[in-house]
């Protein structure tokens, strides 16, 4: 311990002027921010694991591998799309010179000197991959794998980055307060899924004579496990959105925790003890708090989470009554929960309600409406165009009945069941 103090003293003794001291401290601060962003980004990356488990548990066992593959592909192609297009589009729009400069940088030898830029790029990437993965749960069990890959590529390379650029994280053409992405990430993903669900149509047997027929998932414990895995990653999602170690907020951690609790309690009450709705309510509470996690009080976070959780089974049934087959409930869990969180931020973020202030309810409503129109409209159009380009959006009736694990990947998730 004494040796460490001497080394530190020697270091400052060698700093003979203010300039060298400032330079050393700046280097240390940059290194700390790089470390912070990478660690927080890895936590967010863990959410891919959570999504895979949450979605995997909610589909039938004949489609589990397909869900896992889609989640892997979201990440794999998302990395490439974000590197060459998405990462620069979200900050610079369609500025051709910015693209050229970025491509020169990534194809050149300047990478080691841009550690903070690359850490920020990585943190943006994991957010983008989250938005794309949300769509997977809504269109499960009947979409062609090739169609999904193309949809995911366009979301990560174009639709998500453009939405970021238009919103508060980019040029703020449509401004609203969205600290960690209730609308930018989750709302967008949920409403892109809604548009794709409408274009795709329901699974075989999901509706008979216009009446909904439940199709149960194969493993509820897996889904619950996935919800808790997502919750762990959410601390990186929200706390990491400060983007700098020096700006980290304990309030964000507290409001995130209380919203998670509120979401689970709300869904538990509204669903009358349904395990799957409660697990999804936890996620909905976390989605809703993202927008105002830095400006509402912990009690405000609890209220936001509670309302987001209460609406999950209600909105799920409304979507079902509309004849739409949202397999994993991504519309209520991400879409409407994101909208609720954004709008309530404009209320509970006000100082009169114990918030930090600096938010506008009108801006929050405008942002929510913009997200709904942008996401649903482009999700529907994209799915239709992809279907035309590939000669169909869905697998055949025979393949759907067989299950996408065998039809698309030639491998069952539980092969021991085929052994006599």
UniProtKB/Swiss-Prot annotation:
GO biological process, one term: ammonium transmembrane transport
Family the entry assigns: Belongs to the ammonia transporter channel (TC 1.A.11.2) family.
Gene3D superfamilies linked to this entry: Ammonium transporter AmtB like domains
Cellular compartment(s): Cell membrane
Function: Involved in the uptake of ammonium/ammonia (NH(4)(+)/NH(3)). Transport is electrogenic.
Record's protein name: Ammonium transporter Amt2
Gene that encodes it: amt2
Keywords assigned: Ammonia transport, Cell membrane, Membrane, Transmembrane, Transmembrane helix, Transport
Complex formation: Homotrimer. Interacts and forms a complex with GlnK2.
Species assigned in the record: Methanocaldococcus jannaschii (strain ATCC 43067 / DSM 2661 / JAL-1 / JCM 10045 / NBRC 100440) (Methanococcus jannaschii)
């Amino acid at each position: 311990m004494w040796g460490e103090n001497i080394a530190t003293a020697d270091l400052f003794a060698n700093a003979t002027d203010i300039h060298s001291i400032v330079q050393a401290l700046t280097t240390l601060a940059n290194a700390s921010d790089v470390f912070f962003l990478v660690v927080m980004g890895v936590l967010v990356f863990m959410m891919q694991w959570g999504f895979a488990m949450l979605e995997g548990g909610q589909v039938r066992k004949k489609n589990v591998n397909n869900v896992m593959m889609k989640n892997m592909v979201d990440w794999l192609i998302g990395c490439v799309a974000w590197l060459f297009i998405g990462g620069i589009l979200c900050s610079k729009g369609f500025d051709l010179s910015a693209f050229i400069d970025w491509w020169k940088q990534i194809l050149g030898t300047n990478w080691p000197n841009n550690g903070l830029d690359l850490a920020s790029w990585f943190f943006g990437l994991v957010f983008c991959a989250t938005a794309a993965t949300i769509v997977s749960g809504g269109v499960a069990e009947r979409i062609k794998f090739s169609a999904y890959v193309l949809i995911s590529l366009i979301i990560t390379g174009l639709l998500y980055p453009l939405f970021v650029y238009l919103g508060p994280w980019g040029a703020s053409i449509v401004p609203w307060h969205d600290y960690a992405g209730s609308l930018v990430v989750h709302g967008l993903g949920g409403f892109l899924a809604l548009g794709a669900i409408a274009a795709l149509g329901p699974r075989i047997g999901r509706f008979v004579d216009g009446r909904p027929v439940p199709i149960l998932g194969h493993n509820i414990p897996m889904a619950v496990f996935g919800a808790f895995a997502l919750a762990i990653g959410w601390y990186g999602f929200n706390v990491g959105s400060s983007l700098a170690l020096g700006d980290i907020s304990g309030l964000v951690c507290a409001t995130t925790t209380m919203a998670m609790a509120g979401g689970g309690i709300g869904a538990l009450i509204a669903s009358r003890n349904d395990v799957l709705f409660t697990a999804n309510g936890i996620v909905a509470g976390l989605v809703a708090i993202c927008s105002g996690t830095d400006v509402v009080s912990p009690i405000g976070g609890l209220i936001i989470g509670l309302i987001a959780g209460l609406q999950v089974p209600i909105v799920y049934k409304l979507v079902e009554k509309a004849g739409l087959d949202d397999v994993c409930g991504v519309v209520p869990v991400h879409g409407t929960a994101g909208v609720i969180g954004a709008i309530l931020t404009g209320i509970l973020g006000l100082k009169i309600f114990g918030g930090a202030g600096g938010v506008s309810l009108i801006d929050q409503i405008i942002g929510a409406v913009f997200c709904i129109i942008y996401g649903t409209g482009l999700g529907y159009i994209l799915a239709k165009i992809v279907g035309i380009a590939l000669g169909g959006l869905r697998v055949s009736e025979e393949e759907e009945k067989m299950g996408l694990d065998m039809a698309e990947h030639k491998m069952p998730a539980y092969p021991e069941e085929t052994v006599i």
